[in-house]
Amino acid sequence: MEPNQQRSCGSSSDSSATGTPQGSNVAVWRPWHDAPRTHVQNPPTAQQQFYSDNQSHMNDKGKPPSFQHPVKLFWPKSRCYDFMYQEAEELLRHFPVQATISLYQETDSDSDSEEEDIYEN
């Protein structure tokens, strides 16, 4: 490819649409987007090698091979303290990803009837 052709690839309308200066190929990283592919293949890190070696093992158990980020875990407000003390370790042991925990109000009438039984006795 000739040098003139390379310069014509990045037009001024392209640079104004992306908000990056002309001639810059730097993309803004967002954690919820897939990582951009590069032409240079870096050797895998120990952690990447571990996950790639165990990928088939994880798929055999029915777990998804990858997660779409951001991951949001929903937890009932009535069990908020349980989460903070006992069940948090178990949850994180079985779901080791970066996630946001969102508390929600339970609408199940079973939890309400249990509370009423305690006060009636």
From Swiss-Prot:
<feature type="region of interest" description="Disordered">
    <location>
        <begin position="1"/>
        <end position="69"/>
    </location>
</feature>
<feature type="short sequence motif" description="WRPW motif">
    <location>
        <begin position="29"/>
        <end position="32"/>
    </location>
</feature>
<comment type="similarity">
    <text>Belongs to the ripply family.</text>
</comment>
<keyword id="KW-0217">Developmental protein</keyword>
<dbReference type="GO" id="GO:0009880">
    <property type="term" value="P:embryonic pattern specification"/>
</dbReference>
<keyword id="KW-0804">Transcription</keyword>
<feature type="compositionally biased region" description="Polar residues">
    <location>
        <begin position="39"/>
        <end position="57"/>
    </location>
</feature>
<dbReference type="GO" id="GO:0001756">
    <property type="term" value="P:somitogenesis"/>
</dbReference>
<dbReference type="GO" id="GO:0043433">
    <property type="term" value="P:negative regulation of DNA-binding transcription factor activity"/>
</dbReference>
<keyword id="KW-0805">Transcription regulation</keyword>
<dbReference type="InterPro" id="IPR028127">
    <property type="entry name" value="Ripply_fam"/>
</dbReference>
<keyword id="KW-0678">Repressor</keyword>
<protein>
    <recommendedName>
        <fullName>Protein ripply2.1</fullName>
    </recommendedName>
</protein>
<dbReference type="Pfam" id="PF14998">
    <property type="entry name" value="Ripply"/>
</dbReference>
<dbReference type="GO" id="GO:0000122">
    <property type="term" value="P:negative regulation of transcription by RNA polymerase II"/>
</dbReference>
<dbReference type="GO" id="GO:0005634">
    <property type="term" value="C:nucleus"/>
</dbReference>
<comment type="function">
    <text>Required during somitogenesis to regulate somite differentiation and the positioning of the presomitic mesoderm-front. Represses the expression of genes involved in somite segmentation by acting with the corepressor tle4 to down-regulate the transcriptional activity of tbx6. Also regulates retinoic acid signaling during somitogenesis and is necessary for the expression of aldh1a2/raldh2.</text>
</comment>
<keyword id="KW-0539">Nucleus</keyword>
<feature type="region of interest" description="Ripply homology domain">
    <location>
        <begin position="69"/>
        <end position="104"/>
    </location>
</feature>
<dbReference type="GO" id="GO:0045892">
    <property type="term" value="P:negative regulation of DNA-templated transcription"/>
</dbReference>
